Amino acid sequence: MFDFGFSELVVIGVVMLIVVGPERLPKVARTAGHLLGRLQRYVSDVKSDIQREMQLEELKKLQQQVQQQAQALESSVRTEVAQVESSVDQVVAAIKADAAPPDNTTSAESQAAADPAAVDSSQQLELRLDTTPKQVVGSDKA
């Protein structure tokens, strides 16, 4: 705290002995020691308070930085998610467009894709084929 050498302390002690006297010198020295101790404790308390405030200020700055970085990360994630959603929507639309029948197909082709039995009946109608067997009347061979 103070930069005193041994010779300077001896000079101060001799001056105090002359001014205060030998009877009261121990009492004054004890009181000075107590006051010096209080002063040192007060200075250390002030230092610790200042350090605490500085740490709180640093923590607040650090918290703000973390919050800003978190917000930046959140916004970048949101933009990436929006881009992925739009690309997924485009793929879904393309798949739906490929799955839908084209406009230039005939009704028979669309029926063929839907039901093979319907194709047979439509072809039979077009060819006018009869699927039921005819019985010949009068030719009984029994």
Curated annotation (Swiss-Prot):
<keyword id="KW-0997">Cell inner membrane</keyword>
<feature type="region of interest" description="Disordered">
    <location>
        <begin position="99"/>
        <end position="142"/>
    </location>
</feature>
<keyword id="KW-0812">Transmembrane</keyword>
<keyword id="KW-0811">Translocation</keyword>
<keyword id="KW-1133">Transmembrane helix</keyword>
<comment type="similarity">
    <text>Belongs to the TatB family.</text>
</comment>
<dbReference type="GO" id="GO:0033281">
    <property type="term" value="C:TAT protein transport complex"/>
</dbReference>
<dbReference type="GO" id="GO:0008320">
    <property type="term" value="F:protein transmembrane transporter activity"/>
</dbReference>
<feature type="compositionally biased region" description="Low complexity">
    <location>
        <begin position="107"/>
        <end position="124"/>
    </location>
</feature>
<dbReference type="Pfam" id="PF02416">
    <property type="entry name" value="TatA_B_E"/>
</dbReference>
<protein>
    <recommendedName>
        <fullName>Sec-independent protein translocase protein TatB</fullName>
    </recommendedName>
</protein>
<keyword id="KW-0653">Protein transport</keyword>
<keyword id="KW-0813">Transport</keyword>
<dbReference type="InterPro" id="IPR018448">
    <property type="entry name" value="TatB"/>
</dbReference>
<comment type="function">
    <text>Part of the twin-arginine translocation (Tat) system that transports large folded proteins containing a characteristic twin-arginine motif in their signal peptide across membranes. Together with TatC, TatB is part of a receptor directly interacting with Tat signal peptides. TatB may form an oligomeric binding site that transiently accommodates folded Tat precursor proteins before their translocation.</text>
</comment>
<dbReference type="GO" id="GO:0043953">
    <property type="term" value="P:protein transport by the Tat complex"/>
</dbReference>
<keyword id="KW-0472">Membrane</keyword>
<dbReference type="InterPro" id="IPR003369">
    <property type="entry name" value="TatA/B/E"/>
</dbReference>
<keyword id="KW-1003">Cell membrane</keyword>
<feature type="transmembrane region" description="Helical">
    <location>
        <begin position="1"/>
        <end position="21"/>
    </location>
</feature>
<comment type="subunit">
    <text>The Tat system comprises two distinct complexes: a TatABC complex, containing multiple copies of TatA, TatB and TatC subunits, and a separate TatA complex, containing only TatA subunits. Substrates initially bind to the TatABC complex, which probably triggers association of the separate TatA complex to form the active translocon.</text>
</comment>
